[in-house]
Amino acid sequence: MYETRESLGSIRFCLGKEDGRMNLAARKHSPPNLRNGILAAVIAAFALAPVALCAQADCLACHGDATATDATGHSIAVDGQKFGASIHGSLQCTNCHADIKGYPHPDKIAPVDCKTCHADQAAALKNSVHADSKDHPCTSCHGNAHEIFPKTDARSAVYPLNVPKTCGQCHSNGGMAGKHGLPSVYPNYIDSIHGFALSKEGLLVAANCQSCHGSHNILSHTNPQSPTYKSNIPKTCGTCHAKIEADYEQGVHGKAVAGGNLKAPVCSDCHTAHAILQPTEAEFRMQSTPICGSCHKDKFSTYRDTFHSQLGSLGGYVETARCWDCHGAHDVRPASDPSSPINQANLIATCGRCHAGANASFVKYQPHANARDRKLSPALYYIRLFMNLLLAGVLIFFMIHTILWVIRSRYNQVKSKAANGGKNA
């Protein structure tokens, strides 16, 4: 409990304007007993208060001056209008600056401890990747401490449309990213389908940084509790893409991940995490096959031998069939599954999407025929073996023929020279 004399000093700080005396409107016109009662009540209230709750106007008498600076030249100005409109506008200055008990106050005051009110957020932050960052106080994300607005207010630094720019202060090329080795993801995000929807179209439902990473409790992607941990990514993306998540869970990839196989692909393996393109874009279609090939190397190799691949890679024809045009995208199923587009019963319909008039003979074509695999393609395997043996036999035959021809030619030259008495013919 603070001493009465300290509380009295606080009364002068809060209510005194010139010489510390109370300036009550009824001072001259109230009966003495009433004035004394009011004074006693005020003194009692402040005597019991641990910290003087001073009116904002008293602080703004100095800090409301836009040119106000401290001894180091750092601005200590506070915009009274903006502060009044902020989420903290109803608070008194000393609610946050609790070590100030009177005026004049020390030049150096204690840093504001936000967890006094925001204990849950502080606890979450303590366990996050930002916990050890000395350069990451609350104001790094929420903005000027005296101008913090609700996240639903367009003026807020954490309003959905503003979040990428706020995070980009650190996670962009140079600056904090270069200094601390942070991922520089802002440039990729802002050009992605999510970034375009947010920044160009103003869609509040488009995914921003918080949508995937969280806010105060941001965990490393290597932490199993993180929403960006590999096995959690389908659920995270499914927050918006519910149908796609359901399809993915029914496919071979989703079942593999659910079974603990973290080598199986999740959303970010195919779409990337931040530079997500519209699937209909030419760039995405051109990139999609090598992405599948990074896991399915044998199938990618045989695909590259096909007309589909050569038309796309050499001819630059974007609309040629890619892996997902035949196998599906999210609910990829084995050929043995009756619902798979590459099941024998569905091949005519699958091929018919591009090849009108496709029939039973047409779908006998083997898109992944492998002449090196005797079990998969026995006819091709033996044809290739025969052609290789034929080629080798022809080369060996003519190599022997050439060597014998050279020997015979040399022999004839020597014989002819001997017949002419040592002279060349």
Roles of regions detected by a PLM:
Residues 37-51:
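Bacterial N-terminal signal peptides
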Residues 1-35:
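N-terminal secretory signal peptides that target proteins for export/translocation
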